[in-house]
């Protein structure tokens, strides 16, 4: 069946594209500023490193929430506590709501006795930083920093199933003040 789109629908699509472009620009501008604050250096262009599939890789079923948001399930702790998270390419921080992540139920959690406060382009969260085992698609990383939010900061997301943000960005963009090896990306290299 053919459908004819009118000028109003085209404007709506353009508004969405414009809004999405502004979101991406703001995200990367914030990342560049955080990188500079953490390292004292300006970001450079990708250094041309050849990427190859690592032995510690797996596959994960992802669901697209909207045009720029991917959602999937990870496990935190021992035994693993399943968490549905939004993957965040703009930060290495992992932040989970307190009603979902229970460090006292994990044999491998450690309270760093350190607080955090982060603001994303939407939700903000504050709480305590722990380290624990994190497993994504069968790839296990130890001693990963997890911000356990003192509130359910993701409560505005659809269906109420998303309990946190899972950072996949460069460790130098982090705001937890932990060593690179305590981010998920850093820990998988060990």
Feature names for model-found ranges:
Residues 1-190:
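Non-catalytic N-lobe/flap surface of aspartyl protease domains
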